């Protein structure tokens, strides 16, 4: 078996590029840019007023003038105006272009206005450019404002729409099929007999993928029949770029999948990781059809943990154990936990250990899992470890 770190490195090294596509900005939330975005103009395009108040010439204020005649009002969204007399001032609104001949804005809170006269009631020292957002201080036209591979979250949307982008080039998300296997599984609409289980695993995997922006996820089921598995694979590899199998990858008599994949020319990169749960995990590539093959254990906790740890591109945060915990096997252990936060902004992780990887009901109160390192048996309260959220 290989280590968790080695498995991560192998998957990252062999994960294919699924290409890119152009789409409307409206539907691009959460996608990853496949192009760099450049500013189409200076930003701000002109000196911009940052506070409602009055605009005036700093030189007059610096020379001691504290009373100014009010000569007009400038609203946001109007062409740039000009101050005709430097002994006067103009009312200006946030977002307006700073009038010509003005280089100082004084907020309403620091002036008194009566009978078209403005009195400065806070005669403090001021500098030119106060409450002014200078032209091109954020960026010049032509500057790259979002790098390729940036994720299109809320701030990124603000940026690209501010510069007139209505369509963006993004990395293509693959078509995915999740395949449950096993003669013991029945539809969730059926009432299972005592020797049967509802095939719930794949729904947990599906919503986990959908929560990360993978919307094109199909579900199907296969019996423990080698010929059925072969026929399905030969068709599915042409329709989907990623095939995720749940179950059928261990050493049981009816665990045909690794044998079938080898027979059909899949290149195996991983089969067995020194971890609990999820030890039998499989990863391979069919290089002829460029299809990714992911084999997850059939136990619910194992499949969810492996998906989140290796295939959802999740960056961990670090959380602190609330109590001592012991795990004596020489394996990386993924420990379900419930998070809480202290007033000092410390993230605490309360262990919710399970008896076995089929005890999925115990996950109901958990927020995710800690990754406890291999070659360590005792983990002390207060120690910090990587946390992955469901």
UniProtKB/Swiss-Prot annotation:
TM spans, by residue? none
- Cited SUPFAM superfamilies: MoeA C-terminal domain-like (SSF63867), MoeA N-terminal region -like (SSF63882), Molybdenum cofactor biosynthesis proteins (SSF53218)
Q: Please give one Pfam family short name.
A: MoCF_biosynth
Reported EC number(s) for this entry are: 2.10.1.1
Kindly list the cofactors needed.
Answer: Mg(2+)
Query: Which reaction equation describes what this protein catalyses?
Result: adenylyl-molybdopterin + molybdate = Mo-molybdopterin + AMP + H(+)
Alphabetized, the UniProt keywords read: Magnesium, Metal-binding, Molybdenum, Molybdenum cofactor biosynthesis, Transferase
Free-text remark on how the cofactor is bound: Binds 1 Mg(2+) ion per subunit.
Q: In which pathway does it act?
A: Cofactor biosynthesis; molybdopterin biosynthesis
Biological process GO terms, please? Mo-molybdopterin cofactor biosynthetic process
GO cellular component terms, A-Z:
cytoplasm; cytosol
Q: Which InterPro entries match?
A: MoaB/Mog-like_dom_sf, MoaB/Mog_dom, MoCF_biosynth_CS, MoeA-like, MoeA_C_domain_IV, MoeA_C_domain_IV_sf, MoeA_linker/N, MoeA_linker/N_sf
Domain of life, per UniProt, equals Bacteria
Summarizing the function annotation, the protein's role is:
Catalyzes the insertion of molybdate into adenylated molybdopterin with the concomitant release of AMP.
Q: Record's family?
A: Belongs to the MoeA family.
Q: What is this protein called?
A: Molybdopterin molybdenumtransferase
High-level lineage: Bacteria, Bacillati, Cyanobacteriota, Cyanophyceae, Synechococcales
